[in-house]
């Protein structure tokens, strides 16, 4: 299948633009994220990518090209960062594939209305890239209810989430990917669920640690002991239309870096100019690959290749951003002192954040192993 926009997509694009212009009337604060999700829900813009089996759960059905149009226009409008995307793009498709009818009816409409927010409980201090090393447990108590005990880390949006989908070990003594289950845990359990923000080197706290101390979990998706299958199915969803949205953001960042180079005169350096041109060309290539994959033309290793390209590209852009500014890119404002914190500028924030691009979501080393072992058929890495 080749990916190509349809003639009818022009009308849909205009509808999206008009709606966004009418509703993006004031800046959306972090506290307003929930309100914006509900606004999106009322507009019918949540769940566009859910498959046809989701009909009747409150979402609007859209073609693949319409999903891309929505994602592109949302990014171009500089609309607020989503706080409901984990439920919409990860949990909902997982429930459609593995959930019971009762689970779909309970959770999908609330996600489509923008009323319930989710976070993901996968990584642990000793199980990040090696997800099969999960130690969090879920055991039945005296009443037969499952209680979750353990720690998750790097959990985005945990402070705002109503629910967390958790990969936990339900078979005592099980090893690796055996004996795991996929559980849905309510976050509002004082004394049983604790969220601690993680301060990053950029000064922000986008990630959290989550501690479960006998937290109740009555919902299990995909059957007991089948958590690995469900978890891997969910991870495959983390690549797709959202990649195109990310690339539009990358293009805006690249434009700002180029403007800085022009304004400062750094663009007269032929080596730096060549690096900027290469960034532009590689971004165009990534977009083509993303559209090709969405059209069904990518091979089994396409998601891993895309992750490698994206992480390296963004990291190099961050390095360029501070290099272009020269010494000013490495120091704070004139009134900085060792005892007074200062706000990082845009280039510094970009540089510091992009150091993580080759790590989160599966490190470069993991992606190369996947390509080598699962696509090229090379021997497994010795352990």
Range-by-range predicted roles:
Residues 1-85, 106, 110-113, 270, ...:
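Amphipathic, small/basic residue-rich leader segments at the start of a protein or domain
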Residues 2, 65-69, 90, 227-228, ...:
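Glycine-rich phosphate/cofactor-binding loops in nucleotide/flavin-utilizing enzymes
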């Amino acid at each position: 299948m080749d990916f190509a926009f349809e003639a009818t997509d022009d009308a849909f694009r205009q509808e999206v633009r008009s709606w966004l212009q009418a509703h993006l009337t004031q800046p959306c604060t972090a506290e307003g994220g929930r309100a914006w999700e509900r606004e999106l829900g009322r507009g019918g813009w949540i769940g566009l990518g859910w498959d046809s089996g989701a009909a009747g759960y409150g979402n609007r059905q859209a073609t693949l090209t319409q999903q891309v149009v929505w994602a592109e226009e949302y990014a171009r409008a500089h609309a607020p960062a989503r706080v409901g995307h984990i439920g919409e793009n990860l949990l909902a498709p997982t429930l459609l594939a593995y959930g019971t009818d009762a689970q779909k009816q309970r959770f999908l409409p609330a996600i489509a209305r923008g009323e319930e927010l989710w976070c993901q409980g996968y990584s642990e201090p000793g199980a990040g890239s090696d997800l099969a090393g999960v130690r969090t447990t879920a055991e039945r108590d005296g009443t037969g209810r499952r209680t979750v005990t353990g720690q998750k880390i790097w959990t985005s949006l945990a402070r705002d989430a109503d629910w967390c989908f958790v990969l936990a070990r339900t078979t005592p003594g099980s090893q690796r990917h055996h004996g795991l289950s996929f559980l849905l845990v309510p976050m509002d359990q004082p004394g049983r669920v604790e969220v601690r923000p993680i301060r990053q080197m950029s000064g922000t706290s986008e990630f959290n640690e989550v501690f479960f101390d006998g937290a109740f979990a009555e919902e299990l998706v995909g059957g007991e002991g089948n958590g690995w299958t469900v978890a891997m199915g969910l991870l495959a969803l983390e690549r797709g239309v959202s990649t195109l949205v990310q690339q539009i953001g990358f293009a805006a960042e690249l434009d700002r870096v180029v403007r800085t180079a022009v304004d400062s005169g750094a663009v007269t350096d032929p080596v730096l100019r060549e690096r900027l041109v290469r960034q532009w060309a590689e971004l165009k290539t990534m977009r083509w690959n993303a559209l090709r994959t969405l059209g069904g033309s990518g091979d089994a290793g396409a998601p891993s290749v895309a992750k490698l390209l994206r992480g390296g590209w963004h990291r190099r852009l961050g390095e360029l951003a501070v290099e272009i500014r020269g010494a000013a890119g490495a120091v704070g404002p004139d009134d900085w002192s060792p005892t007074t914190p200062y706000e990082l500028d845009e280039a510094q924030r970009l540089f510091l954040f992009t150091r993580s691009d080759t790590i989160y979501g599966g490190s470069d080393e993991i992606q190369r192993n996947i390509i080598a072992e699962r696509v090229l058929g090379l021997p497994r890495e010795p352990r």
